[in-house]
Amino acid sequence: MPGEERERFLAGLHVGVLGVADGDGRAPLLVPVWYRYEPGGDVIVQTGRETVKARLLRAAGRFSLCVQDENPPYRYVSVEGPVTAVDDPVDPAERDAIAHRYLDPEEARAYLKSTAGQLADDITFRMRPQRWRTANFAAFAAEFSEADRIDRDG
């Protein structure tokens, strides 16, 4: 994917899969996350201060995030980079923005109200994408579709 397309795709509404090294010699920890990204900026994720994810993010100092389109033609963007900042405590405006990104306004208000008590226990990690990996299978899907048509009509 060209640069602008990949940035727009990452900024789109997806549940991301965050990956972070596990220093215990195990496979990386992979977890679904809500995130926020604006083209040219940092990837922003929030988690509980005492979670395994937070501990591993602090230790590794970097993480990856992968987002995908689950509908044909399939596409994905994966970014990896260093943690550029840890906001502790969470900025309530940032938490609000992430909730409103994933939920309609009424659901977001209810979610934020019901989880207000955990605000003091959450932290924000910011990552500046350094490596990008992308794929857009639209061309493959078009070729496959054309080959299938030729086989049927052939």
Where are these predicted regions, by residue range?
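A generic secondary-structure signal marking the coil-to-beta-strand transition
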Residues: 6, 14, 41, 75, ...
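Hydrophobic alpha-helical segments typical of transmembrane helices
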Residues: 2-5, 53, 94
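Short secondary-structure boundary/capping segments
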Residues: 7, 35, 55, 115-117
